[in-house]
Amino acid sequence: MLPYPQIDPVAVAIGPLQIHWYGLMYLVGIGGAWLLASRRLNKFDPTWTKEKLSDLIFWLAMGVIVGGRLGYVLFYDLSAYIANPLLIFEVWKGGMAFHGGFVGVMIAAWWFGKRNGKSFFQLMDFVAPLVPIGLGAGRIGNFINAELWGKPTDVPWAMVFPPFSDPAQLARHPSQLYQFALEGVALFIILNLYARKPRPTMAVSGMFALFYGIFRFVVEFVRVPDAQLGYLAWGWVTMGQILSLPMIIAGLLLIWLAYKRDPSASKAAA
C-alpha cells in the first residue's frame, strides 16, 4: 500500500482569501493549452495572430467552466439544485462534469469558428490535442482534494484517503491517478502523435472522442460512483459510462466519415 501524500487543498491563504490547488490546476490546463496551441498555430492558420488565439482559448475556457458546471447540475445532482438554485453559483464547493464541459467547448468552438472563418471540425481538430493538458491537471486537482477515489482493493498501490474524505478509511484504487495517466498522459501522446501528419477533417476529433470515451468507461469500473446516483443499471453501470458510450460511438463514426470523405488520406495512413 502506498501512503497518500497529505497536501493541503489550499495552496495559498491570505486572510479570508483562499486559493485552492484545484483552481490552480484549471490555470495550468488553460496556460498549457495556450502554449501548445501557440506552437501549432502556424500549421493551423498562418494568418492567425496570438491575440486571436488568446480569444479562442478564453472562450473555450468559458465553455469548460459554464458547461462543466451545468453538466454536473443536470446529470449528477439535479434535485439538489432544483431545491436550492443558488447552489449552482457556489462553484468553490466543487461539482464539475467533463461531459458538460465538453459540450461547452463544442458550443464555444462553433460560435468562434463561425465568426472567424473556420468550420466547427476545423477548430475541434485543432483544439482536441490541447484538451488532455487540462484533463490531466484537473485529475491532479481531484487527487489533492482527495475526491473521486476508487473502490476498495488490495493492490500494492492502493491508498487510504484522509478521514474527512473517506470516513471508512479503506485502502482504495487511486482512480484519479488512473485517469491522469489515461486521460492526461496517454491521450495527450496519442492525439499529438496522430496530429503530427495531415489528417482528414474530423479524424482528430474522432480520435479524441473515441479514446477519451474508452478510457473513462474503463476507469469507471474501479471508481466509486457519485453517492447521490450510485449505479444506474445492473449493479455496475455508472453515469460516467452512460455519458461516455455515445462518445465512443461518435468517435468511431467521425473517423469512418473522415476517411470515407478523403480516401487518399486512408491510403496515405496505410
UniProtKB/Swiss-Prot annotation:
Checking InterPro entries in the record gives: Lgt
An example of a Gene Ontology cellular component annotation for this protein is: plasma membrane
Q: Which GO terms describe its biological process?
A: lipoprotein biosynthetic process
Source domain of life: Bacteria
Q: Broadest EC class?
A: transferase
Pathway(s) this gene product operates in, as recorded in its UniProt entry: Protein modification; lipoprotein biosynthesis (diacylglyceryl transfer)
> What is its membrane topology?
Multi-pass membrane protein
Q: Which residues cross the membrane?
A: 10-30, 56-76, 92-112, 120-140, 175-195, 202-222, 237-257
Alphabetically ordered keywords of this record: Cell inner membrane, Cell membrane, Membrane, Transferase, Transmembrane, Transmembrane helix
**A GO MF term:** phosphatidylglycerol-prolipoprotein diacylglyceryl transferase activity
E.C. number(s) listed in UniProt:
2.5.1.145
**Subcellular location as annotated:** Cell inner membrane
Q: In which residues is a 1,2-diacyl-sn-glycero-3-phospho-(1'-sn-glycerol) bound?
A: 139
Query: From the record, what ranges are coiled-coil?
Result: none
**Function of the molecule:** Catalyzes the transfer of the diacylglyceryl group from phosphatidylglycerol to the sulfhydryl group of the N-terminal cysteine of a prolipoprotein, the first step in the formation of mature lipoproteins.
- Similarity comment text for this entry: Belongs to the Lgt family.
The protein, known as:
Phosphatidylglycerol--prolipoprotein diacylglyceryl transferase
